[in-house]
Structure formats: structure tokens, C-alpha cells
Curated annotation (Swiss-Prot):
Residues 65-143 are annotated as: Domain II. This is Holliday junction branch migration complex subunit RuvA. InterPro entries: DNA_helicase_Holl-junc_RuvA_I, NA-bd_OB-fold, RuvA, RuvA_2-like, RuvA_C, RuvA_C_sf. Residues 144-152 are annotated as: Flexible linker. Homotetramer. Forms an RuvA(8)-RuvB(12)-Holliday junction (HJ) complex. HJ DNA is sandwiched between 2 RuvA tetramers; dsDNA enters through RuvA and exits via RuvB. An RuvB hexamer assembles on each DNA strand where it exits the tetramer. Each RuvB hexamer is contacted by two RuvA subunits (via domain III) on 2 adjacent RuvB subunits; this complex drives branch migration. In the full resolvosome a probable DNA-RuvA(4)-RuvB(12)-RuvC(2) complex forms which resolves the HJ. Pfam families: HHH_5 (PF14520), RuvA_C (PF07499), RuvA_N (PF01330). It comes from Methylobacterium nodulans (strain LMG 21967 / CNCM I-2342 / ORS 2060).
Length: 205
């Protein structure tokens, strides 16, 4: 099994990179996010590798970090998720953001991935929610806040602040995290306009 490759970027394809390692070209399939972060052709690169062996082929999947590779494996434990869908999810969400999305039940963020509809996004959240914190630390306050928003029990100023940030174009995950941070500074009785202002300050960092 191949666990890591270090070589020179030979060329790129739509969903893969060919890595030249001592004269041998390895075709490595990657998420769009990973491909975007690799260097230009001719420069050195290294990737953590997941090797899939079948009767008729050997396929390599490459990742910029061990965390991304672990999520690739974990995603495939859910029915309906294969390698293509797993790479699609990792193309739109960083490992830390994916952990937050699952822990907070943000199905909309996950459903943005190609090949993932609302039903599969809900299944991913349901089956992986208890496992997500083990892969990346998620603020317990953020989880509680997300649960309150989902159940419509959050204070109105909180819900209004999150909605306002989302309407400004921020993803639900980032908006919720920013308001959670704002709440810690402003206190539970803060007005929506205060939470929005402090939330925007958090997002600008």
C-alpha cells in the first residue's frame, strides 16, 4: 500500500494530478480544493495517499493533510457515499468546516457538494454527528446555538443576527460561529444589531 508520495508535478487533469516520483508518473485523484492548492507543473509536491485496490485496477487518492484523508474514509462509511461523492464534499468544505457542519446539523452546507442532495446530507449529519468532534474540535456553544436555531428556540435577536449575516452572503456555518462568538462577548441579552456588528467583526478577522 502507498501511504504518501513526494515528487514533482508532471501535469493536471480534471480531477487528478500526475506526480512524477523518480521517473514514475502516478495518477492521483484529488478533491478540487486540493488540486487548487498544489503547485504549478514542474514544482515539488507531496500528498498523503489512500490506495484502493480492485481486481481490475489500483486507484490512488491524494490529500494535503491526514485530516482530509481521515474524513475521506469516514464519509464512505455512510450508505450512498462513494469515493466520488466523498471528494465532492471535501471540494466544498475544509475538514474543520465539515466537522462543524455535521456537528451543528448544517445540512445546507453539505448539500452544496456535487452529488449530495438534501436526503443524503441529512443522512451524513445523522450518522456522523457523534463522530465529528473526534476529528476536529467544535465549540460546544456553537453546537447548542445551532440546535436552538434548528428547533426555533433560539432568542429572536440571535436568529435575526444569523439570518442577517446569511443574507449578506456568509455561509450558515460561518454566520452561526460568528454570532456564537459575539454572544460570548456581548452576553445573552444583546440586541440583534449588536450581534450583527460583532459578528461582522469576527468574520473580518
Amino acid at each position: 500500500m502507498i501511504g504518501k508520495l513526494k515528487g514533482v508535478v508532471d501535469s493536471y487533469g480534471e480531477d487528478f494530478v500526475i506526480l512524477d516520483v523518480h521517473g514514475v508518473g502516478y495518477v492521483v485523484h484529488c478533491s478540487a480544493r486540493t488540486l487548487q492548492r498544489l503547485p504549478p507543473v514542474g514544482e515539488a509536491a507531496d500528498l498523503a495517499i489512500e490506495t484502493h485496490v480492485r481486481e481490475d485496477m489500483i486507484r490512488l487518492y491524494g490529500f494535503r493533510s491526514d485530516a482530509e484523508r481521515e474524513w475521506f474514509r469516514l464519509l464512505q462509511t455512510v450508505q450512498g457515499v462513494g469515493t466520488r461523492v466523498a471528494l465532492g464534499v471535501l471540494s466544498v468544505l475544509e475538514p474543520a468546516d465539515l466537522a462543524t457542519a455535521i456537528a451543528t446539523g448544517d445540512k445546507g452546507a453539505i448539500a452544496r457538494a456535487p452529488g449530495v442532495g438534501p436526503r443524503l446530507a441529512a443522512r451524513l449529519v445523522a450518522e456522523l454527528k457523534d463522530k465529528a468532534p473526534a476529528f476536529a474540535p467544535v465549540d460546544p456553544a456553537l453546537i447548542r446555538l445551532a440546535g436552538a436555531v434548528e428547533e426555533r428556540t433560539a432568542p429572536q435577536p440571535v436568529a435575526d443576527a444569523i439570518s442577517a449575516l446569511v443574507n449578506l452572503g456568509y455561509p450558515q456555518i460561518q454566520a452561526s460561529a460568528a454570532v456564537a462568538a459575539a454572544l460570548q462577548g456581548a452576553g445573552e441579552g444583546a440586541e440583534a444589531k449588536t450581534l450583527i456588528r460583532l459578528g461582522l467583526r469576527e468574520l473580518a478577522r
